[in-house]
Design a protein with these regions (language model features):
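Surface-exposed strand-loop-strand hairpins of Gram-negative outer-membrane beta-barrel proteins
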Residues: 1-18, 340
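Outer-membrane beta-barrel porins/channels
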Residues: 24-360
Length: 360
């Protein structure tokens, strides 16, 4: 709902309607067969790419005069590599490295006033940024009762920590225009980050019975550190962005209908980390949201053609974004006054997912 001193001439009330198609591939295996020990040691990896695998480095960072949502968009390539093992009876630990890319590009060229270049030199490099992920899981019955009949039957708790990560790009260009801009030339430098994930600490508990289980997780995300990260972002450093840490409760349940079909469902309440109504030039939009998810898993123990069991999973998540007011501002000298537009935003997001799992 636009209003203000100089509202934009919008063709519709839709600010953002851009689909994202992410593909994940992963594997888990027991490495104990490679050693003389029978103690299980598990290794796994998961990789994510955008647009069904066609975009390895999907990336976008820009200012916006019409407003842009903070939380949604394409995700660039990432890779998680990790291992896990049982250290004590009923106590499992895991350690993973999350790998993202930090890219650098340097351009040096002579050019004329028409933009024709000569004597070009271009250098592009990308280096990995590695961040830790740690997990701990405790099966109370196995730990305290050795797996026999116990008052703690079906109770498990888990603790995890994921270090912050992002994708960063730096571009530095130097141009010389003979007769206009002599050596050492005009230097243009841009540094920006995208796909930021904060430090996340999660504590969860589940109660399991023969055919069902229910779990509750509290997830603490330290978004306040992002304010300092944006100080070195040449696209967003003027926005004076401030973020708050948030606590997200998640509740989920699973019910096994029969040997083939399992149903799942869950709900989460997520507060926005974005503080304030203004972010100069960038004009970020975000609000609290409620997440509701439903899913089903079909396990085929004797699928046609294949010699091993096959699992097919399907899920749907609906996100309800609450209403919130924002004031759009700009440093553009053509803008008559600030804020030039006040908008009231709300929306929804639908996420469809499917997965195929083979065990062999």
């Amino acid at each position: 709902i636009p209003a203000g001193a100089a509202p934009l001439g919008r063709s519709s009330d839709v600010i953002q309607d851009t689909p994202s198609q992410q593909t994940l591939i992963g594997m888990k295996t027991n490495l104990s067969s490679l050693t003389k020990s029978e103690h299980p040691i598990y290794f796994g990896f998961i990789a994510g790419v955008e647009k069904y695998g066609e975009e390895m480095l999907a990336f976008n960072s820009s200012t916006s005069n019409s407003g842009q949502y903070f939380s949604y968009g394409r995700q660039p390539l990432f890779l998680n590599l990790g291992g896990a093992t049982e250290i004590l009876r009923g106590i499992d630990v895991g350690l993973t490295a999350r790998v993202t890319l930090h890219a650098d590009a340097e351009l040096y060229a002579y050019t004329d006033l028409q933009g024709n270049t000569s004597l070009e030199s271009l250098n592009v490099s990308a280096k990995p940024s590695i961040r830790p992920i740690f997990g701990l899981n405790v099966n109370w019955a196995e730990t305290f009762c050795g797996g026999g009949d116990c008052a703690f039957d079906g109770i498990e708790t888990a603790l995890s920590f994921r270090g912050h990560s992002n994708t960063e790009t730096r571009v530095e260009a130097t141009t010389i225009i003979p007769g206009t801009i002599p050596s050492p030339g005009l230097n243009l430098a841009i540094a920006t980050l995208d796909a930021y994930q904060p430090d996340i600490t999660a504590l969860g508990m589940q109660y399991r019975q023969e055919r069902w289980r229910v779990g509750l997780t509290l997830e603490y995300q330290t978004w306040s550190d992002l304010s300092n990260e944006f100080e070195s972002d040449t696209i967003k450093d003027q926005a004076n962005l401030n973020f708050q840490d948030i606590l997200i409760p998640r509740l989920g349940a699973e019910f096994r209908v029969n040997d083939m079909l399992t149903l799942t469902g869950g709900i989460a309440l997520e507060e926005t980390p974005l503080e304030g109504k203004r972010s100069l030039d960038v004009n970020y939009l975000d609000a609290d949201r409620t997440l509701i998810g439903l899913g089903a898993t079909l396990e085929l123990r004797d699928p046609p053609v294949l010699a091993y069991p096959l699992s097919l999973s399907f899920g749907y998540q609906y996100q309800m974004i609450d209403e919130r007011d924002f004031e759009l501002t700009s440093t553009d000298p053509m803008v008559p006054s600030n804020p030039y537009e006040t908008v009231n935003t709300k929306g929804d997001v639908s996420i469809f997912s499917g997965s195929l799992t083979m065990k062999f």
